Design a protein with these regions (language model features):
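Intrinsically disordered, low-structural-confidence terminal and linker regions
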Residues: 1-16
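Short Lys/Arg-enriched alpha/beta "domain-start" segment
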Residues: 16-57
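Active-site metal-binding core of divalent-cation-utilizing nuclease and nuclease-like domains
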Residues: 56-72, 76-80
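Short, well-structured alpha-helical interface segments that form or flank functional binding sites
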Residues: 70, 84, 109, 236, ...
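A broadly used, surface-exposed interaction patch
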Residues: 71-123
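Internal, well-ordered alpha/beta segment that forms a basic, Gly-enriched binding/recognition surface
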Residues: 115-138, 142-280
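Hydrophobic, aromatic-lined core segments that form the binding pocket/scaffold
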Residues: 210-492
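Acidic, carboxylate-rich catalytic segments that either coordinate divalent cations
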Residues: 476-523
């Protein structure tokens, strides 16, 4: 291999790439690099001061936000002689970005403690700026009226300029980011329980996760039992299924629709009629039909023809479109498509019986289901377990939604399933198994309860998400862990964060979990 000095690509990169650009003092670094510098605190931390001269002590830089708003959430910062506070941090290139980007008019930025910037361009204008004195003053960026409470909650936060406070030249930090992207949290930013948990072997870690997972599972089961007392077992299950189809963005609109199921289900048996009714009730139908005839417009016209005849009957319970959130949604998770899937489930009058039969079916070797009430005794293949439930829940083919993400999207080249393995796992862990378990408990069928618990324990891990990633890094100090090979172990990790992390701050003040782990491991 040629020496590095003879590497022509290295020469190109040095002369014309990011490193070269960062040598230009008039060329600000990319904001992504500033975010990495802040996250890993590549700063001369003892020299940090706000633009007005107050000292800044960063007890924790916060966690990267994945859902818009400020760049970092949950930071713990002490400014001057004040007590440390928890809040958000926003990163911008220029101090003037606070107003230029509309942060001062955005309620999502009301908890920002510190505005971290590369240079002080605009900082004096920001300091002298006054909030609008007149109520109802227009906000040109968002073209809406600003309520007084929003204006009062969002004065400019203290500004911290870091361009001259780095712990290494900016070009060197640029190479650090490009060549060795830091994926795990630095040791000092992990939770205080991380050391205690990492001292345990995989088996003992698994025991803690399993115990937490059982707590979470039983809490979900209790929720179904409580709802069934008022609405019945079948209605409780449908509400759970709809909630799960809403994911984190649209849980409540889906729940609202499901609660009204006894009213709108009557007289709409075929899947298409149910699709039209659900899409109409949801408020997600386009307000106007297109003038030109495109590929999917025939389906939309048929839906409107169906909904037009009955919309007055349901006008008092039709949801406004504004209750739905679309930002950050994957196309496959669009609520229009999820409601189409729910319509197919509702059209299958035997769906609940199929789910109940599945709970006692022999799955590991593909044999037929056992007589109702009997529980299989042999081991279960996790892969076949997922496949067996997917066959019950999946839709073979939908004339429109197998080929489109939304009403307005182009026709796909290949049909896409309305339900994948990742969503099956969400449904089984959060809805189906807890519902089946609590029904078995009500019937005092302990044998069936144990079988359902076993399926929960062996179900393959769920799709990764930002909550799990952060929890792994904070509690286990790793991007991946062999202890998290099942969906139930993931649920256990989430439960620990709910029970302990969410009741403390980023520096783990007054958190008893590390002490409890150490006591348990030595007991």
């Amino acid at each position: 291999m040629s020496p590095p000095t003879e590497n022509f690509y290295a020469d190109w990169r040095s002369r014309f790439g990011l490193a070269n650009a960062l040598r230009d003092e008039n060329h600000p670094p990319p904001e992504r690099l500033l975010q990495a510098i802040w996250r890993h605190q590549r700063l001369q931390r003892d020299r940090l001061q706000t633009a007005d001269g107050r000292s800044v002590r960063v007890l924790h830089p916060g966690f990267v936000s994945v859902e818009g708003g400020p760049d970092f959430r949950g930071a713990v910062i002490q400014i001057g002689d004040a007590a440390p506070r928890s809040g958000d941090v926003e990163i911008d290139l220029r101090a003037g970005g606070w107003r230029a980007h509309g942060h001062d008019r955005n309620p999502e930025f009301k908890n920002v403690l510190l505005h971290v910037v590369w240079d002080d361009v605009g900082v004096h204008a920001l300091a002298s700026a006054k909030l609008p004195a007149q109520l109802g003053s227009a906000c040109p960026t968002h073209r809406r009226t600003i309520p007084q409470r929003e204006i009062e909650l969002q004065p400019p936060p203290p500004t911290l300029v870091i361009g001259d406070k780095l712990d290494a030249p900016i070009a060197e930090l640029g190479l650090w980011l490009e060549n060795d992207p830091p994926r795990d949290l630095p040791e000092k930013l992990r939770g205080q329980c991380c050391v205690a948990l990492r001292e345990l072997d995989e088996k003992r870690q698994g025991k803690i996760l399993d115990a937490a997972a059982r707590v979470r599972f039983q809490a979900k089961a209790e929720q179904f039992r409580a709802r069934a007392r008022h609405a019945g077992w079948e209605q409780a299950l449908w509400e759970g299924l709809f909630r799960a189809l809403g994911y984190k963005h649209n849980v409540w609109p889906m729940q609202n629709l499901a609660e009204l199921r006894p009213r709108w289900l009557r007289g709409a048996d075929p899947a298409f009629a149910l699709q039209a009714r659900l899409l109409g009730l949801s408020g997600l139908l386009p307000a106007e039909l297109p003038r030109t005839q495109a590929g999917g417009d025939g389906y939309l016209r048929r839906v409107w023809d169906c909904w037009w005849r009955e919309r007055n009957e349901f006008s008092d319970c039709t949801l406004p479109r504004a209750v739905w959130k679309f930002h950050g949604l994957r196309p496959a998770n669009h609520p229009q498509r999820r409601l189409a899937l729910a319509a197919h489930w509702l059209a299958d009058k035997k769906l609940i019986s199929k789910i109940e039969n599945w709970s006692v079916a022999e799955i590991s070797d593909g044999r037929a289901a056992l007589p109702r009430g009997q529980v299989p005794q042999c081991g279960i293949s996790p892969a076949k377990l997922v496949d067996s439930l997917r066959k019950i829940l999946e839709v073979e083919r939908d004339e429109f939604w197998s080929w489109h993400w939304t009403f307005r999207s182009a026709r796909l080249k290949k049909p896409q399933p309305l339900l994948g393995d990742a969503r099956v796992t969400d449904l089984v862990v959060n809805v189906i198994l807890p519902w089946l378990w609590t029904r078995a408990a009500e019937g005092k069928n302990e044998k069936l309860q144990r079988a359902i618990e076993h399926r929960y324990a062996v179900w393959p891990q769920a799709e990764d998400n930002s909550i799990l990633k952060l929890a792994r890094q904070r509690l286990l100090g790793v991007g991946r862990s062999r202890a998290l090979r099942s969906a139930s172990a993931q649920q256990g990790l989430i439960q620990i964060t709910r029970d302990f992390c969410e009741h403390s701050n980023a520096v783990c003040d007054n958190c008893r979990f590390p002490e409890l782990v150490r006591g348990w491991s030595t007991g």
